[in-house]
């Protein structure tokens, strides 16, 4: 008997959702370019689902929007929460139509290992803790990037970028002795520097997911 050439299995992936809140493509392009300039490595090449709930009653050229995003190296896999007219456009463009629903309950994750870094992480450096939590005894400087599939604990200042829960774990957290980050992300939900400025702290703080947003908690020293 010959071996199977393929096998179809059900699985799940963590995808970022881009919420379109304006049908003006010129305004969209300008705002998107600004965000991309702040964190290009976080966005470029990332698969996205487009949420069209806010523009479902407007005349949106989905083909032009797709071109706008692809020109910026963003990969569009489908749309969600769209009007029948936009769904028809999406199918003509070969995009998936994804139904919005409650998040499925995930199985408990196995206990992770911990990757420990006993030095400062400097500009241009990237550290990735695959299938592990990341503990840094030092600061994460401007232009540095730290990524973990689990949580990130920084015993110093966070001034660069920190991305926890990279494998999709919503329960991951980011803890730092002071929070002055360029970007923080937990399982695809992110804040850029402009949002973080109102939360910048010289005290020990924890960032965690709060539904479809993030929240900051001050911790005891």
Curated annotation (Swiss-Prot):
* Keyword terms, alphabetized: Cell cycle, Cell division, Septation
Q: List the GO biological process terms.
A: cell morphogenesis; division septum assembly; regulation of cell division; regulation of cell septum assembly
Coiled coil region boundaries: none
- The lineage's top-level taxon is Bacteria
Cell division as UniProt keyword: yes
SUPFAM superfamilies according to UniProt: Cell-division inhibitor MinC, C-terminal domain
Q: Does the keyword Cell cycle apply?
A: yes
Primary role: Cell division inhibitor that blocks the formation of polar Z ring septums. Rapidly oscillates between the poles of the cell to destabilize FtsZ filaments that have formed before they mature into polar Z rings. Prevents FtsZ polymerization.
Which family is annotated? Belongs to the MinC family.
Describe its assembly.
Interacts with MinD and FtsZ.
Q: What is this protein called?
A: Probable septum site-determining protein MinC
Q: Please give the organism.
A: Shewanella denitrificans (strain OS217 / ATCC BAA-1090 / DSM 15013)
Q: Which gene encodes it?
A: minC
């Amino acid at each position: 008997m010959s071996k199977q050439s393929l096998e179809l299995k059900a699985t799940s992936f963590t995808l970022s959702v881009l919420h379109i809140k304006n049908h003006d493509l010129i305004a969209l392009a300008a705002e998107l370019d600004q965000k991309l300039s702040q964190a290009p490595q976080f966005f470029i090449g990332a698969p996205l689902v487009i949420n069209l709930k806010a523009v479902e009653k407007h005349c949106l050229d989905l083909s032009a929007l797709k071109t706008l995003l692809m020109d910026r190296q963003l990969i569009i896999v489908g749309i969600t929460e769209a009007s029948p007219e936009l769904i028809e456009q999406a199918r003509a463009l070969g995009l998936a139509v994804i139904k919005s629903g409650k998040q499925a309950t995930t199985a408990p994750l196995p206990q992770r290992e911990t990757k420990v870094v006993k030095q400062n992480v400097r500009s241009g450096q990237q550290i990735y803790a695959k299938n592990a939590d990341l503990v840094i005894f030092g600061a994460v400087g401007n232009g540095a990037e730290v990524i973990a599939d689990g949580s990130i604990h920084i015993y110093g200042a966070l001034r660069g970028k920190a991305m926890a829960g990279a494998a999709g774990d919503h329960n991951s957290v980011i803890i730092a002795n002071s929070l002055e980050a360029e970007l923080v992300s937990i399982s695809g939900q992110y804040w850029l520097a402009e949002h973080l400025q109102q939360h910048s702290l010289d005290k020990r703080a924890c960032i965690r997911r709060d539904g479809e947003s993030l929240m900051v908690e001050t911790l005891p020293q």
